[in-house]
UniProtKB/Swiss-Prot annotation:
Signal peptide: none annotated. It is found in: Cytoplasm; Nucleus. InterPro entries: CRA_dom, CTLH/CRA, CTLH_C, Fyv10_fam, LisH, ZF_RING_GID. Disulfide bonds: none annotated. Keywords: Cytoplasm, Metal-binding, Nucleus, Zinc, Zinc-finger. GO terms for cellular component: cytoplasm; cytosol; GID complex; nucleus. GO terms for molecular function: ubiquitin protein ligase activity; zinc ion binding. Belongs to the FYV10 family. Its main location: cytoplasm. The lineage of its organism: Eukaryota, Fungi, Dikarya, Ascomycota, Pezizomycotina. This is Protein FYV10. The gene is FYV10.
Length: 410
């Protein structure tokens, strides 16, 4: 029977990995509520003001009946606009509640289990793996494949497809040298960006200024100066270096090479803005900066990694993944020594084992495989072999028991 401590589920680690699974819908619901509140506050003030002006003008005879009807039509249009916007907020809230309910149920399933031997754990683990793969694909721009996988596995409520698709759309617009969608996103999250002291909007405005100056035409240069006065100069205390560079760009056109300004004219700045957007987006939504799959994989690799996994023999094994299965080292089942994971696991720490689970009666077979003697004898007995023969548990090779050699761990 397996050691209970080795099969017991560490629920705290599971919950630690799935923090964003529950936090993101909650944060999005708060944002959705603020949007609905803003719509009601802003639009109701406009309707109230128009109603008051209409009533006052009508009583004083300043408005004709046609003017009053036009104002009433305008108020009705605004009211319909409020209803439409609130309906969108209501639909979004219902979607987020559905997501949150599905995620609470998903996390609750593992909380109700005690060991990995539970028959439900394998299915739960497969669902979690599908979630991590979808998250990885969304972060790397494979949106259609991620959606197809989520729909096929029925886990759409457990992954943040809409959030990452919106992010990738803005990222793509920056790659196409447009800041329009990114600025709209900054406007939607103005208060939150101010709280985290983000410089993303300033860098977008700075890039707008650079593109205006790049044209080197008088109207565009004058527009750039106006743009700088409105969006850059007010931040001269916060970003003095960038503001000084903006002023210097007027004296150093693109065709003149200068170490201080050549990097500002380079198109790689758009890649920098794209990277900065992703960092800001993840920070704003409390998302990990790298895929959750990497976290889970690194933990698993570390738990299995030993110093022998990156010896010369292990590297030779990783370089020859198609070797014949009859060879002892080439048929190793160690995932760290495999060609796919050997390089990935090189920088993760070694496993920390406070308790040994190595069999006490290890013996070496002629094919250089090591097993516990009791296991070999039991397997031979179940296989109907003579009492003086043993059978390799993996390859099925049969050897005389006299050819086994005792193994001592040093």
């Amino acid at each position: 029977m397996a050691d209970h401590q080795t099969t017991k589920i560490d629920k705290s680690n599971h919950l630690l990995l799935d923090q964003t699974l529950l936090r993101l819908p909650y944060d999005l619901m708060r944002k959705n509520f603020r949007n609905a509140h803003f719509v009601v506050e802003h639009e109701s003030k406009a309707i109230t003001k128009l109603l008051k002006d209409t009533a006052t003008g009508s009583l004083k005879g300043k408005h004709s009946s046609d003017d009053v009807l036009k104002n009433i039509d305008a108020m009705l249009a605004k009211a319909k606009g409020i209803k439409r916007k609130l309906q969108a907020c209501s639909d979004e809230e219902a979607r987020l509640y559905r997501q949150l309910g599905a995620r609470i149920k998903h996390v609750g399933e593992v909380v109700s289990m005690e060991t990995v031997d539970d028959v439900r754990y394998e299915q739960w683990s497969r669902t979690r793996l599908d979630r991590l793969i979808v998250d990885y694909m969304l972060r790397h721009g494979y949106n259609e494949s991620a959606c197809a996988l989520a729909d096929d596995r029925g886990i759409r409520d457990l992954v943040d497809i809409d959030t990452f698709i919106h992010m990738s759309r803005i990222q793509e617009s920056l790659a196409n040298r447009s800041v329009t969608e990114a600025l709209a996103w900054c406007h939607e999250n103005k208060k939150e960006l101010r709280k985290i002291d983000s410089n993303f909007e300033f860098m977008l405005r700075f890039q707008q200024y650079i593109e205006l100056v790049r044209s080197q035409t008088l109207p565009k240069v004058l527009e750039a100066i106006t743009h700088a006065r409105k969006y850059l100069i007010p931040f001269k205390e916060t970003y003095p270096h960038e503001v000084n560079q903006a002023a210097g760009l007027l004296a150093y056109p693109p065709e003149q090479t200068s170490d201080s300004y050549s990097n500002l004219w380079g198109q790689e700045r758009w890649e920098m803005l794209s990277t900065l957007f992703i960092e800001t987006h993840h920070r704003l939504l409390s998302l990990p900066s790298f895929p959750l799959l990497h976290i889970a994989l690194s933990s698993g690799l570390s738990a299995l990694k030993t110093p022998a996994c990156h010896t010369a023999g292990a590297r030779d094994l990783a370089d020859t993944p198609n070797s014949a299965p009859g060879n002892s080292l080439d048929s190793s089942m160690c995932p760290i020594c495999s060609a796919e994971l050997n390089e990935l696991a090189e920088n993760v720490p070694y496993a920390h084992h406070s308790k040994s689970h190595v069999e006490h009666d290890l013996v070496l077979l002629p094919n250089d495989r090591v097993y516990g003697k009791a296991r070999l004898e039991e397997y031979a007995r179940k296989s109907g072999l003579p009492h003086n023969c043993v059978k390799d548990l993996r390859t099925g090779e049969i050897y005389p028991a006299s050819r086994m050699k005792k193994v001592f761990i040093t």
